[in-house]
Structure formats: structure tokens, C-alpha cells
Design a protein with these regions (language model features):
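Mature catalytic domains of secreted/periplasmic carbohydrate-active enzymes
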Residues: 1-402
Length: 402
């Protein structure tokens, strides 16, 4: 709702954060106006799931993964176990159900993202100061987990110690619920589920999900960031890429914004179309997929600036999608002086490529070479040496000449 900061719900309770200052100046003290008070203002009155699905298809997407619930604990679906949901409060609509129907109607694959596991600590900053978070009857704010000696549990400590038993049981109940209600083909998770204390619970979830998928006669995917082998889930790199071809399929999840995930009033930091296409090509050349985030407004519309970027990506894929969809890695991902950035949280700035930077993909006996910058009319592919199979013909996608 505030359209000011991605982790507004947490940082509005941190007295050392600029978000706290902004909140107090704009909405008043956190004792009187807490995060819960934004929810009735969230109406999604212009939300059109069919328009969203058409846009995503036009952008060239093959699968769509709405957020069922983020760290803040507000569910965008009809939950029996969480009264803080979009059917009972705010929009009075089952956002997930409506999107699922629209996405499937466009012939796209439907997944869900859940961050319920992070809710147990997300509002713990509010326990340090007088705030509505200290009212433990407000279940939206989760466990407010604290360290044994009193200080509020930080994100870094959560990385070390995980959650608690009650929050893990709570998480599992919610996962069973969205599996049963929506039958997603993909479930994406953030980092807490990868911590050792969470893993026993997560294995129970995976067994339930995979066994149900057999009954549905569907192939399903689980995305995690660490803690589990590539043979049981699909590895995900947040806002980053791999530096090599990975033997198993993997995924980059990133945002259309250089910094934001959620809607921000200042959209000057949108990534360029070229930036996103370069990343897509590099990711696919290394056996990966791209999950691209957009930040809608509270009224349910996707800003026109973001729509424009998506449509331009779609236009490029209409011509060049043959080198992307249903392809496999070649014997090497590419060549050229710029190997690109690798690792988590490394993609905010665009890599500077030259016409010597090329990425490879294959389909059957066809090798696709995508040049990451405009050339002077000539391209030299050094990887096609005499040791490689002979080249029978060369053509450019979108051009009938050879």
C-alpha cells in the first residue's frame, strides 16, 4: 500500500530506518497506525486477472507464479487457517483463485510463491518499541521470535537458528491448504525453509506435494535456494545467475526493477529491455529459466511502464524465441570477454557486452548463437573450430536469407 519500500512492513518498526521516519510523518505513531491498518485500504478495485494473464502471455511467459502470501502474513487466497486474507479483508476477492483460472485459460503453467516461513520473525522489530506488534492477539504478526536473552531475533540469527516448532507446524498446515485448494505446478520458497531446523518439516511437505501430483497426473516443481539436492528440487538464485552450465535445470528469480520487488512510486530504476533479454539469454545458455517479477499497484493494475517492458520482451521472443524455448545447453554456454556476473544479488546493474560476447543454445541438430551486442555486420564464432561438427548452413532468425 505505501509504495515506499520493499520491506515496509518490517522496517516501519525499526527506529533506525528511514522507513520508520517516513511512516510516523505520513501515517502517525506505530502504536496507533500499524501495518494491519493498511490492509482495509487495499481494495484491488481495478484488478483484472484476465488482463494480467494476457499480458504475461504477450510477454512470452510460459509459467506464472503469483505470490500467495509474503513475509507480512497477509494471504491473497481464501484461507481457513489465516483470517488475515484477501477474501475476508481488503479486496474481498480470492486473488489466487482468479489468477489461476485466468492463467490456465491462456494455456500457461500456474505456480505459487509462499513466504509463510518468514512470517515467524518478520515483525520482531516491533517488539523492541511501543507498537501494535506487542498486541499478541493480532495473529497477522506471527511469532515475533526473540532470542533467549531478550533481544529481537534478527534476520541473520534466523539464518543460523531457523524458526520454532510451532511456526513450522503452522507453515506446513498452510502449505497443505494451498496444495489442496489450488494444485499449483510449481511452489517457490525463500530461504528459511532451507535451514537445518526446517528440513524435516520441509521433507514432509515435499512428500505430500509430490504424492498429490501423482494423483493429479501432473509434473510439479519445488524451488528453494539452498539446503536440498538438485535431484529433489530446482535450485533458485535470487537476483543473480550461474557462472557455468548446471547439470540440472535451475532458475533465476529477479525483478523488473533494479531494486524494488513491490510497487514503488518512483519507477526510474526499471531495468532496460536489453538488460533483461541479455540476462535471459545468459541464463538459458546455462540450463536455467527466468522468473521475472513485476510490482502491481494496490488498485490491482500493473504500471504502464512495466507493461511496456514486458511487451517489448515479448516482441523480441516472437522473433528469437526459437533460440530460447525448449532448448538445451551446448558443450559450452558461450564465448567472449564478458562472462557476466554470477551469484546472489548481483544483477542490479547491466553487464556491458560487446559483439564478441555470444551465448549458445541447441535444439536437435541446430546450434543457436545469440550475440549480446550489435555488430558491424560481421560475427566471428571462435568456438566453431575444426573439432566441432561441420556447419551445413547459417541463417538469422527473423530473416529468410541464408
Amino acid at each position: 500500500m505505501p509504495a515506499y519500500d520493499g520491506w515496509y512492513a518490517r522496517n516501519m518498526y525499526d527506529v533506525n530506518s528511514h522507513v520508520y521516519k517516513h511512516h510516523v510523518e505520513t501515517y502517525g505513531p506505530v502504536t496507533e497506525f500499524g501495518f494491519k491498518d493498511f490492509i482495509p485500504m487495499f481494495k484491488a478495485e481495478k484488478f483484472d486477472p484476465q488482463a494480467w494473464a494476457r499480458l504475461f502471455k504477450e510477454a512470452g511467459a510460459r509459467y506464472v507464479v503469483p505470490v500467495a502470501e509474503h513475509h507480512d502474513g497477509f494471504a491473497l487466497y481464501n484461507s481457513t487457517f489465516n483470517p488475515w486474507n484477501s477474501v475476508k479483508i481488503g479486496p474481498k476477492r480470492d486473488i489466487v483463485k482468479e489468477l489461476r483460472a485466468a492463467i490456465l485459460a491462456e494455456g500457461l503453467h500456474f505456480g505459487l510463491s509462499s513466504h509463510r516461513a518468514e512470517n515467524c520473525w518478520f515483525f520482531s522489530e516491533g517488539m523492541k518499541i511501543p507498537s501494535d506488534v506487542q498486541d499478541t492477539t493480532i495473529t497477522l504478526y506471527g511469532e515475533r521470535i526473540q532470542e533467549p536473552d531478550g533481544p529481537t531475533l534478527s534476520r541473520e540469527v534466523v539464518h543460523q537458528d531457523g524458526s520454532n516448532e510451532h511456526s513450522r507446524r503452522d507453515w506446513l498446515t498452510h502449505m497443505y491448504e494451498i496444495i489442496d485448494q489450488y494444485q499449483p505446478e510449481l511452489l517457490y520458497f525463500d530461504w528459511t525453509v532451507g535451514k537445518e531446523p526446517f528440513q524435516e518439516t520441509f521433507y514432509k511437505f515435499m512428500a505430500y506435494y509430490y504424492n498429490n501430483a501423482i494423483d493429479w497426473n501432473k509434473g510439479v516443481v519445488v524451488n528453494t535456494k539452498f539446503g536440498y539436492g538438485d535431484n529433489i528440487q530446482v535450485f533458485d538464485i535470487e537476483r543473480g545467475k550461474s557462472d557455468q552450465i548446471r547439470p540440472y535445470p535451475w532458475q533465476t528469480d529477479t525483478s523488473i526493477g533494479k531494486v524494488f520487488w513491490f510497487h514503488h512510486k518512483d519507477e526510474s530504476d526499471l531495468k532496460s529491455v536489453n538488460h533483461l533479454i541479455d540476462d535471459l539469454v545468459d541464463i538459458v545458455s546455462k540450463n536455467g529459466n527466468l522468473l521475472l517479477n513485476v510490482g502491481p499497484r494496490a488498485d490491482g493494475t500493473i504500471p504502464e511502464s512495466q507493461q511496456k517492458v514486458l511487451r517489448e520482451i515479448g516482441h523480441w521472443l516472437q522473433v528469437n524465441g526459437e533460440a530460447i524455448y525448449e532448448t538445451r545447453p551446448w558443450i559450452k554456454s558461450g564465448e567472449g570477454p564478458n562472462k557476466g556476473t554470477a551469484g546472489y544479488m548481483t544483477d542490479s546493474e547491466q553487464s556491458v557486452y560487446t559483439s564478441k560476447d555470444i551465448r549458445f543454445t541447441t535444439r536437435k541438430d541446430i546450434l543457436y548463437a545469440t550475440v549480446l551486442s550489435w555488430t558491424d555486420g560481421f560475427v566471428t564464432i571462435e568456438s566453431l573450430s575444426e573439432d566441432v561438427k561441420p556447419v551445413h548452413s547459417v541463417s538469422m532468425l527473423g530473416c529468410d536469407e541464408q
